From Swiss-Prot:
Residues 91-308 form the RNase H type-2 domain. GO terms for cellular component: cytoplasm; ribonuclease H2 complex. GO terms for molecular function: magnesium ion binding; RNA binding; RNA-DNA hybrid ribonuclease activity. Its EC number is 3.1.26.4. It catalyses: Endonucleolytic cleavage to 5'-phosphomonoester. It holds the Pfam family RNase_HII. Keywords: Cytoplasm, Endonuclease, Hydrolase, Magnesium, Metal-binding, Nuclease. It comes from Listeria monocytogenes serovar 1/2a (strain ATCC BAA-679 / EGD-e). InterPro entries: RNase_HII/HIII, RNase_HII/HIII_dom, RNase_HIII, RNase_HIII_N, RNaseH-like_sf, RNaseH_sf, TBP_dom_sf. Belongs to the RNase HII family. RnhC subfamily. It is an enzyme of class 3 (hydrolase). The gene is rnhC. The keyword Cytoplasm applies. This is Ribonuclease HIII. The lineage of its organism: Bacteria, Bacillati, Bacillota, Bacilli, Bacillales.
Length: 308
């Protein structure tokens, strides 16, 4: 399970120690000044002023402190997995997220978006939040309102290009890294000379792996980059990026459905196999490849359905 680590100042570390005293664990790991366990989360504070949250409720617990901590006088490491500076939620940040990676039909879609502190109240009023529970109509309604307000860049990897790259040996993580890096670079160019205080990527790979994927890129964004899972809940920029990415993904999906003349389903379950088999029967395997990620198991399952 992923860990969330935040960097705090000394007074806050002492405050956390007192707050978690009723849940304290007497067994301290090396370098720790306190340890506690609550339902769904273990918390460990270290002499280095780093505090680690582990467990299913770890990120939610950490977020309480990230959102309320005073600004730390010490500068946090600019590129560190899982370490977010104090008061991160109110900083001016470029956030990036992607959709479509687990869908048999449709492109991978990545969006990077910049949100500053002044824009946050309006975005919240317009409904920007963690979008996982939102239905497509709500996503589209909010996206159309915020896109003129938020500097952003959306990049799609269409299915034919995806299949070409995959056959050349590129995995999905590499594709996502390239798209995130370029989308972030695009937003930085739009903002110049303004610079964000940080860049937050919704984490899909370890930091070292992410940068290894980008090794051959002529321009690699490294300064003030942070990685976190469930980053939509850590900064509005990622929530906005997720909403815009999903909006563009839905648009692409609708266009493909109209083009092929069949409503295309999302996901990669059995319901997807049946539609894929119908496309093979009516138009052939080459047509299916135009709209799908060919290496998914759905391709073989659909072929077996056709042969029965």
């Amino acid at each position: 399970m992923a860990n969330t680590v935040i960097l705090v100042d000394q007074p806050t570390l002492e405050k956390m120690k007192q707050t978690y005293l009723p849940f304290s664990n007497p067994k301290l790991p090396p370098g720790a000044v306190f340890a506690a366990k609550k339902p769904g989360v273990s918390i460990t504070g270290y002499k280095s002023r780093k505090v680690m949250f582990q467990g299913v409720n770890g990120e939610a617990e950490a977020k309480k402190w990230v959102a309320t901590l005073p600004e730390s006088k010490a500068k946090a490491p600019s590129v560190s997995k899982g370490i977010l500076p104090a008061n991160f939620a109110s900083k001016n940040v470029i956030g990036s997220d992607e959709v479509g990676t687990g869908d048999f039909f449709g492109p991978i879609t990545v969006c990077a978006a910049y949100v500053d502190a002044e824009m946050m109240p309006l975005l919240k009023e317009l409904g920007v939040k963690d979008s996982k529970a939102m239905k497509d109509p709500e996503i589209c309604r909010i996206a159309e309102k915020i896109m003129p307000l938020v500097p952003h860049s959306v990049l799609l990897c269409p299915n034919p290009k995806y299949n070409e790259l995959q056959k050349r040996g590129m995995n999905q993580g590499q594709m996502k890294a390239l798209l995130h890096n370029r989308a972030i670079e695009n937003v930085l160019k739009k903002l110049a000379p303004i610079k964000p205080e940080a860049i937050l990527i919704d984490q899909f790979a370890e930091k070292n792996t992410y940068y290894r994927y980008l090794a051959k890129e002529p321009s690699i964004i490294r300064e003030d980059v942070f990685f976190a899972t469930k980053a939509e809940g850590l900064h509005l920029s990622v929530a906005a990026a997720s909403i815009i990415a999903r909006y563009k993904f839905v648009q692409a999906f609708d266009a493909m459905s109209k083009e092929v003349g069949i409503p295309l389903p999302k996901g990669a379950g059995p319901h997807v196999d049946a539609v894929a088999a119908e496309i093979i029967e009516r138009f052939g395997l080459e047509t299916l490849a135009k709209y799908t990620k060919q290496h998914f198991a759905n391709t073989e399952k659909a072929l077996k359905m056709v042969k029965k």
